[in-house]
Curated annotation (Swiss-Prot):
This is Pentatricopeptide repeat-containing protein At3g26782, mitochondrial. GO terms for molecular function: RNA binding; zinc ion binding. The gene is PCMP-H34. Residues 534-564 are annotated as: Type E(+) motif. One of its GO terms (biological process) is RNA modification. The keyword Zinc does not apply. PROSITE patterns: PPR.
């Protein structure tokens, strides 16, 4: 075959490579000998480009090397595809060699060669080399800007990516040609903005996207959704608006909006999106979709829905997927079924550090510290090395059970034995462990010895311990530090108010309340969740909105009569108001967890377990009441509060009244 036109030759070579090479699997040399005019550089360029585009990067480099051995003079089109092949192979050595050859032949300043070099160096983690190439480009275009921004984003340098984007805007405003960032570049910029802790940054780039008319595109829209899921200030409403505006929604779109809902505690909305996705015949779901829905289940404690998702996982053959498997473990643990979680854990063929950590954390939050500390050495023996989060889970398990000796042991072993530097979360666990165990001074001394500045979690852990052990002096020290860090957190004021109330210092209680009022601070409402027949019911304190409210209060009144007969005496210390005892008792009767428990008993079969999720710590009175109710009605209640799980059964609690 002899093709005289270079354009025809390009088409012929590409066609033959696609047909014969991928069917008969003939090697590159045979194809060259039969079809390629080896003295023509354009023939070589077409072969290199075709191989690079089809993913045969190694053979693309071989073709480029073969061409150079023939001493052919390469054109500007010879280098970009060869450099792209180096990127795909993460071959920095060949990449630098190709760069050197481009320099020798005078193509280093070519915009397409330079952009390919930026991508290659960024892909190989050589950002300094990439930036040097970028800075030496005499006349940049949008491809070179985008390549460098993406390089920074790819390597986790979010600040540099955002800074370069700002430079682009300045460059663009001064340029009569007005370059326009494309959707690929915007995806990188949005991704970087979402990881920079600067107020309003995500919102600013969102406005930029709208002005450029990219807000309806699926790739940009999905990245914006992910940015808002990571904490964009616009909130859920803005994320939903973005989702609704995306014209051709794909699987990532659905996954992202479900993630926003799940992380915002709006589980019903996440479930509704999933139902819509299941009914959508065009978009299919995958392992990430199921993991996202399982996250929503974990937040809401919707066990029945979680079981349905688990069944779907089994039908799809995804139970061995390490991400999905770990999500199942986490879901069952947070729905109060730690033994079911353990069965799922044991069935996993491939476990990674997250799988082990999820199971250890599950045991810890349920108060099974012994099992958590038994599983931890087994993890080490299996060859899986514990990481930062693993030690947080181990120390938290020790804290829930008051195992201060074991806690110190593993805290001290972190750096020396495993090379994990203790961080704020680990110190927070230790302060919580020592404080709750009554070693307040030791907890305070540990804070004083910290190599890093204590954050609000550290001081709030000590403040909570001060309330348990009624230490007003240390509480005032703690809250002073907390107000320096964050004076707008209602929780700190409420804790201090409770500590003053426990000490009978009502003037100080009123003073704290006046400070809150003057600063416009409002206590976030406590609420409890309970799933029934696939729907999550939400209860507030003194709830007047629930459809069954009249029956619930009637049932509670009857329960209260039985409680009094059983010897119940209300614990009014949790009511932080200077009012008479009768009024305090009336307030306690309508706490959200009691309403949820009553609703659960009324609407489930006798003998079944009732699961409740509380967003705040269960108060002492509710804790005592639920213990007694479990004995009166012969039911088990599993309550997850902000601290841990409580399994109420036969008049007792799994926490041993230590929470």
């Amino acid at each position: 075959m002899k093709v005289r036109s270079k354009k025809a030759l390009f088409c012929s070579v590409s066609r033959l490579l696609h047909t014969e090479r991928h069917t008969e699997r003939q090697n590159l040399t045979t194809l060259f000998n039969r079809y390629v005019d080896k003295t023509d550089v354009f023939s070589w360029n077409s072969v290199i480009a075709d191989l690079a585009r089809s993913g045969d990067s190694a053979e693309a480099l071989l073709a480029f090397s073969s061409m150079r051995k023939l001493s052919l003079y390469p054109t500007r089109s010879s280098f970009p595809c060869a450099i792209k092949a180096c990127s795909s192979l993460f071959d920095i050595f060949s990449g630098k060699q190709t760069h050197q050859q481009a320099f020798v032949f005078g193509y280093q300043s070519d915009i397409f060669v330079s952009s390919a070099l930026i991508v290659m160096y960024s892909t190989c983690g050589k950002l300094e080399d990439a930036r040097k190439v970028f800075d030496e480009i005499p006349k940049r275009n949008i491809v070179s800007w985008t390549s460098m921004i993406r390089g920074y984003d790819l390597n986790g340098n979010a600040l540099d990516a955002v800074s370069l984007f700002k430079d682009l805007l300045v460059d663009e405003n001064d340029d009569d040609d007005a370059m326009f960032l494309d959707s690929m570049g915007l995806v990188s910029v949005i991704s970087a903005c979402s990881r920079v802790p600067a107020k309003g940054l995500t919102e600013s780039i969102h406005s930029f996207v709208i002005k450029r008319g990219f807000d309806r595109g699926v790739s940009v829209g999905n990245t914006l959704l992910d940015a808002y899921a990571k904490g964009g200030e616009g909130g859920v409403a803005v994320a939903r608006k973005i989702f609704d505006q995306i014209v051709d929604k794909d699987r990532v779109s659905y996954n992202s909006i479900m993630s926003v809902y799940a992380q915002s505690g709006m589980s019903n909305e996440a479930f509704e999106v999933f139902r819509r996705l299941v009914k959508n015949k065009v978009v299919t779901f995958n392992a990430i979709t199921l993991s996202t829905v399982l996250l929503a289940v974990s937040h809401s404690g919707a066990l029945r829905i979680g079981k349905c998702i688990h069944d779907q996982v089994i039908r799809m053959g995804l139970e061995d997927d390490v991400i999905v498997g770990t999500s199942i473990i986490d879901m069952y643990c947070k729905c109060g079924r730690v033994e079911t979680a353990r069965k799922a854990f044991d069935r996993m063929k491939n476990k990674n550090v997250r799988s082990w950590t999820a199971m250890i954390a599950g045991y810890g939050m349920h108060g099974h510290a012994a099992k958590a500390l038994e599983l931890f050495p087994a993890m080490i023996d299996s060859g899986v090395r514990p990481n930062y989060i693993t030690f947080v889970s181990v120390l938290a398990a020790c804290s829930h059970a008051g195992l201060h000796v074991e806690g110190w042991r593993w805290f001290n072993a972190m750096k020396g034995r495993f090379g994990v530097e203790p961080g704020l979360e680990h110190y927070g666990c230790m302060v919580d462990l020592l404080g709750r165990a009554g070693f307040l001074q030791k907890a305070y001394d540990l804070i004083q010895r910290m190599k890093m500045k204590p954050d609000s979690i550290i001081w709030s852990s000590l403040l909570a311990a001060c309330r348990i052990h009624k230490n007003v002096e240390l509480a005032e020290i703690s809250v002073a530090r907390l107000f320096e860090l964050d004076s707008s957190n209602c929780g700190y004021y409420m804790l201090l108010s409770h500590i003053y109330a426990d000490a009978g210092r009502w003037k100080d209680v009123e003073r704290v309340r006046m400070i809150m009022k003057n600063r416009g601070l409002v206590k976030p409402p406590g609420f409890s969740l309970l799933e029934l027949n696939g729907e999550v019911h939400v209860f507030l304190i003194g709830d007047e909105e629930h459809p069954q409210r009249e029956k619930i209060y009637e049932f509670l009144a009857e329960l209260n009569r039985k409680l009094l007969e059983a010897g119940y005496v209300s614990n009014t210390s949790s009511v932080c108001h200077d009012v008479d005892e009768e009024e305090k008792e009336m307030t306690l009767r309508v706490h959200s967890e009691k309403l949820a428990i009553a609703f659960g008993i009324m609407n489930t079969v006798p003998g079944s377990t009732v699961n409740v999720v509380k967003n705040l710590r269960v108060c002492s009175d509710c804790h005592n009441v639920i213990k007694l109710i479990s004995k009166i009605v012969d039911r088990e209640f599993v309550v997850r509060d902000a601290k841990r799980f409580h399994h109420f059964k036969d008049g007792g609690c799994s926490c041993g009244d230590y929470w």
